[in-house]
Amino acid sequence: MMRSLNRCSKHRAAWLLLALTTFSLELVALYFQHVMLLKPCVLCVYQRCALYGVVAAGLVGAIAPATPLRFSGLAIWLYSAWEGLQLAMKHTDIQLHPSPFVTCDFFVSFPAWLPLDKWLPSVFSASGDCAVRQWHFLSLEMPQWMIVIFGAYLAVAVLILLAQFFPPRKRDLFSR
């Protein structure tokens, strides 16, 4: 299994599939925001940024998947999935255990050199409250689904990382 994962990580289609699935989740988030009129909170916006990090990882890996450049994509993937998982767990904790002492920020804070909330306010502006439960599906709230999603992305990234230590076998059909 690890050898086949190693072989798969060296193909462009796998990296593009990663970028496509994550970008699809971004489109779903924009649907929730602009069509269903759910208000994203600060942690929701940060989780979106983590998803965009996974999209970027897929695109970096797709540039040259058979070269060591894929390790850069893998590092971005691991970091983004880990940060997204941490944010989703924090968001879930705020929703499940509301407290006046534990809240999220009122405004997103991006670096001065990358003010995404000013450049694309329709995507990166936060107007909701982190403690408000706005949507659920199959008895899980939105941040709980994000735990599942980021956990799956992280688990697959770790498996791909471990698979790099198992070189694929060369198929020699004519030697005996």
From Swiss-Prot:
Spans within the Cytoplasmic topological domain: 1-14, 66-71, 164-176
Membrane-crossing segments per the record: 15-31, 50-65, 72-89, 145-163
Origin: domain of life: Bacteria
Tell me its family.
Belongs to the DsbB family.
Subcellular localization, as worded in the UniProt entry: Cell inner membrane
Record keywords: Cell inner membrane, Cell membrane, Chaperone, Disulfide bond, Electron transport, Membrane, Oxidoreductase, Redox-active center, Transmembrane, Transmembrane helix, Transport
Name of the protein in its database record: Disulfide bond formation protein B
Task: Tell me the gene name.
Answer: dsbB
Tell me which species this is from. Answer: Sodalis glossinidius (strain morsitans)
Q: Which residues form the signal peptide?
A: none
What function does the entry list? Required for disulfide bond formation in some periplasmic proteins. Acts by oxidizing the DsbA protein.
